[in-house]
């Protein structure tokens, strides 16, 4: 018999397998929308965010590269705003440091312009075209002929975000559970 049956003898409305950022964010958002639902999050490791979530680059993406009008584009732009607001509200360290996308050769300009147009169409905040001088002002060790400045992107530790989701689920929704080593 699986271990979780001996730990929990309850019925749940929703069971989510995986205690990474996707599983925990899903459980948290579902509980916010449906506070009476009993949700069980099962994580096989000793702690949440032990795999991909805890080992990625931590980039807060802007929505720059996605096809305009796509769900990915909308969800990325909206999700970035929501993530940054969540991080501020819960005092999770993050840095909205921006990024520079650089064309180092004339042959790259057409693609860079396509990326810029995607960013505008997707509602990426503050995106602007920049020249070689501005590239150097932002990032002195970067060389390019033209570029894009995307000030709304940044970095965050998604393991910290996941741990906060697990903490909030346990504190706010006592009918729901996050169980590790299951």
Tell me what each language-model feature is.
Residues 6-22, 40:
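Beta1/beta-strand and adjacent pyrophosphate-binding region of the FAD-binding site
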Residues 22, 26, 47:
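Conserved Rossmann-like nucleotide-cofactor binding loop
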Residues 27, 31, 168-170:
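Gly/Ala-rich phosphate-binding loop of Rossmann-like dinucleotide-binding domains
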Residues 31-55:
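Glycine-rich FAD pyrophosphate-binding loop
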Residues 35-36, 88, 140, 174:
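Proline-centered flexible-loop/turn and helix-kink motifs
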Residues 58-138, 144:
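Dinucleotide-binding Rossmann-like beta1-alpha1 core, especially the glycine-rich loop
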Residues 148-182:
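Helical element adjacent to the flavin cofactor pocket in flavoenzyme catalytic cores
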């Amino acid at each position: 018999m699986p271990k979780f049956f001996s730990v929990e003898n309850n019925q749940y409305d929703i069971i989510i397998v995986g205690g990474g950022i996707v599983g925990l964010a899903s459980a948290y958002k579902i509980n916010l929308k449906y506070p009476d639902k009993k949700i069980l999050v099962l994580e096989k490791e000793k702690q949440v965010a032990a795999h991909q979530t805890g080992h990625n680059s931590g980039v807060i993406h802007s929505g720059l590269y996605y096809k305009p009008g796509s769900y990915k584009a909308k969800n990325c732009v909206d999700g970035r705003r929501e993530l940054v607001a969540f991080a501020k509200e819960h005092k999770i360290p993050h840095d909205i440091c921006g990024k520079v996308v650089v064309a180092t050769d004339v042959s790259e300009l057409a693609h860079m312009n396509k990326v810029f147009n995607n960013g505008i169409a997707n509602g990426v905040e503050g995106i602007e075209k920049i020249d070689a001088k501005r590239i150097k002002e932002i990032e002195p060790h970067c060389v390019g002929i033209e570029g894009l400045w995307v000030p709304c992107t940044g970095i965050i530790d998604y393991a910290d975000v996941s741990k906060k989701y697990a903490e909030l689920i346990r504190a706010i929704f006592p009918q729901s559970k996050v169980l590790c080593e299951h």
